[in-house]
Amino acid sequence: MSTLVQCGYFERGQCQSCRHIKLPMAQQLAAKNLELQQLLAPFVDKTEPQFLPPVVGDSSGFRNKAKMVALGAAHAPVLGIVSPSGEAVSLCDCLLYPTDMQALLHRLERFVQQAGIPPYRVDKAKGELKFILLTRSQVRGEYMLRFVLRSRDAIARIERELPTLMAEYPQIKVVSVNLQPVHMAILEGEEEIFLTENTRLEERFNDVPLFIRPKSFFQTNPQVAAKLYQTAREWVADFAPASLWDLFCGVGGFGLHCAAKDIPLTGIEIEAEAIACAKMSAQLMGLDKVEFMALDSTDFAKGEAAQTKPELIIVNPPRRGIGESLCHSLSEFAPKAILYSSCNPKTLAKDLGHIRGYRLTKVQLFDLFPHSDHFEVLALLVKD
């Protein structure tokens, strides 16, 4: 584990996103682990060791997604952030990104200049380019590039320059324009216009093929995420469940790692694009007892109250947690075990207070977000 990452942006006071970057990784990890243990102490099963050693990855070059604010002017664009002092700062050399991603981000600044696309000015409500979103697949080093625009006015300019860019960077496989016409701090709008025939990026974690589309959620630290999915697979296998639910399933990462040809799996996710990706993965894996549906997970669970109940349920909610209603539904279903993957230990602790009849037998921290306060937690609840 490396000790310190030397970041010029942080040293100059231009970017404070990695607020703990001056601390050695071991110290960062110890603080996160202590917070986790204090939050979950009221729920742990005192009869067996629950807190497993934290799982870590690289401290730099690990991030697969860049969200760049478009700043500056058409003749001198800047992709990055507004610093605390109000200046436009290019973050193309951010050390969280792999070196090939840094190089492409620099090229995209030149692309915006060559295309003559004016960055959107929030103070004047004028301009076209709001964000550039870049996602990298670790398995092949391929990219999905998205331009978030105020209107369609700049699309022709993007299309004019795109062949040159893709000739230089053939690893760019998906390019799209997202229209976000609202004068609000919203990352993306409803309409997505593809400028390439390909509409998805292929990824692979362990032996599981996964797909990324523009609006589908995907873990930003693939190195540690692969370990997270593999751990979930191993914990679930100990129960040999006859049936599985994967709620808030996203593109299917957890469920597909835990599935088998003879085990029925139901995956539920509100985002239709993610469900389309999960279905493609299941087909590639030859899983014919898998059903993925674009539904609200809480509503689905309520509707299934009188139906056949799964032997094990996986939940991977957003930061808000699963909520009291779904906690009660899970308690009523009474599966053998509940596997809870959380990106917010505070809401995890709150949810654990509403799940009845279970003991917390395993907890493990996965440091997907070095230098920040955030981390992922995998928690195993077993029926009393």
From Swiss-Prot:
Active-site feature positions: 343
Alphabetized GO MF terms: 4 iron, 4 sulfur cluster binding; iron ion binding; rRNA (uridine-C5-)-methyltransferase activity
Annotated SUPFAM superfamilies: S-adenosyl-L-methionine-dependent methyltransferases (SSF53335)
UniProt feature coiled coil, ranges: none
Record: residues binding S-adenosyl-L-methionine: 219, 248, 269, 316
PROSITE patterns: SAM_MT_RNA_M5U (PS51687), TRMA_1 (PS01230), TRMA_2 (PS01231)
Entry keyword annotation includes S-adenosyl-L-methionine: yes
Gene3D superfamilies xref list: 2.40.50.1070, Vaccinia Virus protein VP39
UniProt: [4Fe-4S] cluster binding residues: 7, 15, 18, 94
Similarity field: Belongs to the class I-like SAM-binding methyltransferase superfamily. RNA M5U methyltransferase family. RlmC subfamily.
Its job: Catalyzes the formation of 5-methyl-uridine at position 747 (m5U747) in 23S rRNA.
Protein name as it appears in the record: 23S rRNA (uracil(747)-C(5))-methyltransferase RlmC
Organism of derivation: Shewanella sp. (strain ANA-3)
